[in-house]
């Protein structure tokens, strides 16, 4: 059994009501519940955390190195384009991670095209709405099974 960590960045607590034409109508609670269930069905544990504060996400990433986390799934949201702190935290703990986005940042405004995480992530899944999370988890589960 692997311990997985799912991190959600700023404004994702508003999913379901914030710009549903871009982000869909699925709530964050629905996404988390579905992923926890799927992880458990595959024999893994999944912890979820959403924060609008960069330092909270950084501190949780730091804690992941000590708590047995095997893999991080992260939707950094707006921090994708601005946060060297998240990049450095992820590199500092040395855990594999996958970057997730509900929308396709490359099909949006030019300032959303750059990610400070993508070049260090094992993979990036974007543009499939709430299914982006499910697809990312399936990829992580497959990776863990290959490594077992």
Swiss-Prot record:
Catalyzed chemical reaction(s): 3-dehydroquinate = 3-dehydroshikimate + H2O
EC number: 4.2.1.10
Site (Transition state stabilizer): 18
Record pathway: Metabolic intermediate biosynthesis; chorismate biosynthesis; chorismate from D-erythrose 4-phosphate and phosphoenolpyruvate: step 3/7
NAD found in the keyword field: no
Function field: Catalyzes a trans-dehydration via an enolate intermediate.
Record: residues binding substrate: 75, 81, 88, 102-103, 112
Record protein name field: 3-dehydroquinate dehydratase
Keyword Amino-acid biosynthesis recorded: yes
Organism: Xanthomonas oryzae pv. oryzae (strain PXO99A)
GO biological process: amino acid biosynthetic process; aromatic amino acid family biosynthetic process; chorismate biosynthetic process; quinate catabolic process
Record Gene3D superfamilies: Dehydroquinase, class II
Keyword field: Amino-acid biosynthesis, Aromatic amino acid biosynthesis, Lyase
A GO MF term: 3-dehydroquinate dehydratase activity
Stated family: Belongs to the type-II 3-dehydroquinase family.
InterPro entries: DHquinase_II (IPR001874), DHquinase_II_CS (IPR018509), DHquinase_II_sf (IPR036441)
Subunit structure of this chain's protein: Homododecamer.
Enzyme class of the recorded protein, top EC level: lyase
Residues at the catalytic site: 23 (proton acceptor), 101 (proton donor)
